[in-house]
């Protein structure tokens, strides 16, 4: 049976930076308050770009590093909660078109911050079944477009960006296991209420700020830590791997406090953990591939590295992945 492997990663980080000191001038907050509660110091904003632009630029990097012809890509899948358009066309279709790919499978998924883990599970299935040979997966978000910049509880948390990977078949350094799950009963704790069918876009929903992201932070924090820790234990035990065997633990970059809490529960060292939330904030589905790209560029992510990915997001959704990196 063919095995699926991540053979390359890429990312795109917008140039414009919003610091905590900038936010001090916008809302009732302070650098000290933000850092103490989130660990975040800066985030990047895509002022003159849309989600498909970010995704396209991350995809170009992943394709170049993979050393494959773009025409060998036979599927483009994008995870995003900030698509260019509400219904259609999909962001993936736009990215494929921008790449000059006009006869490929292309579609979006919506799994919030767990999006990249969901993408991995889909790409793994497509490659290992023989349905596809080279799958381009992208997590891309322009969260600045759905943030209420007058709400200090959310506007300090999020940033824009994109991360991409190529998943292909390989005899070694493959994706060992992927687990995804959800619990829709708690979806109201992290939600963008407006602009869907329940609250269609109109003057009333805009006046009530329903088109912005709403989050019950304390409740989400507790559920996230407990769920993430259990999910990691489950996938490690299932595959007879201990935390000491892991070369890099790359969690979703939601909040430094969440990352630290999970790290301590599972006995990961600082050297094992990849942390980028300090510089980029929470970029939802883009955070894991962006963090993988950072680790690759600084030499920590190497061919054959045993990697553990873990994420929790709106829905609620969550998931984890265990893999050996196949990139060069």
Curated annotation (Swiss-Prot):
EC number, UniProt record: 2.3.1.180
Cellular-component GO terms for this entry: cytoplasm
GO biological process: fatty acid biosynthetic process; secondary metabolite biosynthetic process
Compartments, record wording: Cytoplasm
Main location (coarse class): cytoplasm
Matching Pfam families: ACP_syn_III, ACP_syn_III_C
CDD domains: KAS_III
UniProt pathway annotation: Lipid metabolism; fatty acid biosynthesis
Disulfide bonds: none
InterPro entries, per the entry: ACP_syn_III_C, ACP_syn_III_N, FabH, Thiolase-like
Catalytic activity line of the entry: malonyl-[ACP] + acetyl-CoA + H(+) = 3-oxobutanoyl-[ACP] + CO2 + CoA
GO molecular function: 3-oxoacyl-[acyl-carrier-protein] synthase activity; beta-ketoacyl-acyl-carrier-protein synthase III activity
Annotated keywords: Acyltransferase, Cytoplasm, Fatty acid biosynthesis, Fatty acid metabolism, Lipid biosynthesis, Lipid metabolism, Multifunctional enzyme, Transferase
ACP-binding: annotated segments: 253-257
Active site: 113, 252, 282
Domain free text: The last Arg residue of the ACP-binding site is essential for the weak association between ACP/AcpP and FabH.
SUBUNIT field: Homodimer.
Purpose: Catalyzes the condensation reaction of fatty acid synthesis by the addition to an acyl acceptor of two carbons from malonyl-ACP. Catalyzes the first condensation reaction which initiates fatty acid synthesis and may therefore play a role in governing the total rate of fatty acid production. Possesses both acetoacetyl-ACP synthase and acetyl transacylase activities. Its substrate specificity determines the biosynthesis of branched-chain and/or straight-chain of fatty acids.
Listed HAMAP family: FabH
Similarity comment: family membership: Belongs to the thiolase-like superfamily. FabH family.
Record-given protein name: Beta-ketoacyl-[acyl-carrier-protein] synthase III
Species: Campylobacter fetus subsp. fetus (strain 82-40)
